[in-house]
UniProtKB/Swiss-Prot annotation:
Annotated stretches, region: Disordered: 1-27
UniProt region (Coil 2), positions on chain: 263-401
Record InterPro entries: IF_conserved (IPR018039), IF_rod_dom (IPR039008), Intermed_filament_DNA-bd (IPR006821), Intermediate_filament (IPR050405)
GO molecular function terms listed in the Swiss-Prot or TrEMBL record: structural constituent of cytoskeleton
Name of the protein described by the UniProt record: Vimentin
GO BP, one annotated term: intermediate filament organization
Principal location class: cytoplasm
Gene3D superfamilies referenced in this protein's UniProt entry, alphabetically: 1.20.5.170, Single helix bin, Vasodilator-stimulated phosphoprotein
GO CC annotation terms, alphabetical: axon; cell projection; cytoplasm; intermediate filament; nuclear matrix; plasma membrane
Domain IF rod: 97-405
Species this protein is from: Gallus gallus
Family per similarity comment: Belongs to the intermediate filament family.
Region feature (Coil 1B): 148-239
Record key words, sorted: Cell membrane, Coiled coil, Cytoplasm, Cytoskeleton, Intermediate filament, Membrane, Nucleus, Phosphoprotein
Length: 460
């Protein structure tokens, strides 16, 4: 029996060279039968079986001799020349079969070793795959979820801080608007107070001018009063002188009319008129002076009140200006802090986005690696399936050969030679018959698609 494997077999595809995924495997077995007319017919067969430990057991080749020659007489000599030739050819075939069996055993041992190695690699890959499925993915998912929760929490905190700062900014803006409105009102009130103060100053100036105008008539009246007093005194002295002269004349001349009484009456009349005029002038002057003093006091009070209000407004303006400056400074600092927080938030958000992208890339790489491991595992499964199919095919072939070998075959020890007359019997030409069993197995991706068997008989 001879074993031939084509180049497209899965064994050569995996270990002997590359070929396409779909190939056909052709196994050719042959059995040779030798017939020698009615003399000897050797039949050879071999069987190879794989033990669990990888040890191969070979059953010996038996030779089946069948004789159709007529019985020989005991006194005739037996010619073993043909038997020696057949034994020589049988030994040569036996040697060739042993060599071929040794080669097949070596190849099968290498095949078993490679199958075991692939099974170990398959177990390692399965363990790694289970480890990745059980630990790596969940741990990475937990880390990713934890990182995402931290990022979301920080984003929410920054959003709340931003909203709080915006509310504070809006409140400060409202306070600044109210202060500006109040400042505008205070400035308007200040302008009104200044205009009122200006009008009061004008009134004071007018009152001062009126007082000056009134002081001049008073002075003129006082001068007139002094002049009238002097004139009155002169008239009184003249009248007294005249009265003395008249008294003397009266004394001298009693019969003259009484001028003293007349002068006294005139004097009384003049004095009453002068007193009345003086009293009226003093009363008018006092009333005018009282009015002017009262107006001046009122103007002074108004001026003092206006000055106090102006000072108060000035102090309020200064305090409001300080508050506005302080609020401007605090607003600028808050705006600067808000810009810094926005920049920090943007930077942190970019960093978190980069982290998320990196984690997603790592997850994608892990998924691709898992997919690659799964593909490799699937390829190994396909290879294992193809190897299992080939092993099953080998097993079927070996079982077929074993079934043929296990048939009862007589040996040389049990061979009975009968007496025959070789010279009287013609020797039939030796010929051989070869039976070819061609089995074609088509596989694709480790699966058997088609399996056919053909038998061919050739004569030699």
């Amino acid at each position: 029996m001879s074993f031939t494997s084509s180049k497209n077999s899965s064994y050569r595809r995996m270990f002997g060279g590359g070929s396409r995924p779909s190939s056909g495997t052709r196994y050719i077995t042959s059995s040779t039968r030798y017939s020698l007319g009615s003399a000897l017919r050797p039949s050879s067969a071999r069987y190879v079986s794989a033990s669990p430990g990888g040890v191969y057991r070979t059953k010996a080749t038996s030779v089946r001799l069948r004789s159709s020659m007529p019985p020989m007489r005991m006194h005739d000599a037996v010619d073993f020349t043909l038997a020696d030739a057949i034994n020589t050819e049988f030994k040569a075939n036996r040697t060739n079969e042993k060599v071929e069996l040794q080669e097949l055993n070596d190849r099968f041992a290498n095949y078993i070793d490679k199958v075991r190695f692939l099974e170990q690699q398959n177990k390692i890959l399965l363990a790694e795959l289970e480890q990745l499925k059980g630990k790596g993915t969940s741990r990475l998912g937990d880390l990713y979820e934890e990182e995402m929760r931290d990022v979301r929490r920080q984003v929410d905190q920054l959003t709340n801080d931003k909203a709080r700062v915006e509310v504070e900014r809006d409140n400060l803006a409202d306070d600044i608007m109210r202060l500006r409105e109040k400042l505008q009102e205070e400035m308007l009130q200040r302008e009104e107070a200044e205009s009122t103060l200006q009008s009061f100053r004008q009134d004071v100036d007018n009152a001062s001018l009126a007082g000056l105008d009134l002081e001049r008539p008073v002075e003129s009246l006082q001068e007139e009063i002094v002049f009238l007093k002097k004139l009155h005194d002169e008239e009184i002295r003249e009248l007294q002188a005249q009265l003395q002269e008249q008294h003397i004349q009266i004394d001298m001349d009693v019969s003259k009319p009484d001028l003293t009484a007349a002068l006294r009456d005139v004097r009384q009349q003049y004095e009453s008129v002068a007193a009345k005029n003086l009293q009226e002038a003093e009363e008018w002057y006092k009333s005018k002076f009282a009015d002017l003093s009262e107006a001046a006091n009122r103007n002074n009070d108004a001026l003092r009140q206006a000055k106090q209000e102006a000072n108060e407004y000035r102090r309020q303006i200064q305090s409001l200006t300080c508050e506005v400056d302080a609020l401007k400074g605090s607003n600028e600092s808050l705006e600067r802090q808000m810009r810094e927080m926005e920049e920090n938030f943007a930077v942190e958000a970019a960093n978190y986005q980069d982290t998320i992208g990196r984690l997603q890339d790592e997850i994608q790489n892990m998924k691709e690696e898992m997919a690659r491991h799964l593909r490799e595992y699937q390829d190994l499964l396909n290879v294992k399936m193809a190897l299992d199919i080939e092993i099953a095919t080998y097993r079927k072939l070996l079982e077929g050969e074993e079934s043929r070998i296990n048939m009862p075959i007589p040996t040389f020890a049990s061979l009975n030679l009968r007496e025959t007359n070789i010279e009287s019997q013609p020797i039939v030409d030796t010929h051989s018959k070869r039976t070819l069993l061609i089995k074609t197995v088509e596989t694709r991706d480790g699966q058997v698609i088609n399996e056919t068997s053909q038998h061919h008989d050739d004569l030699e």
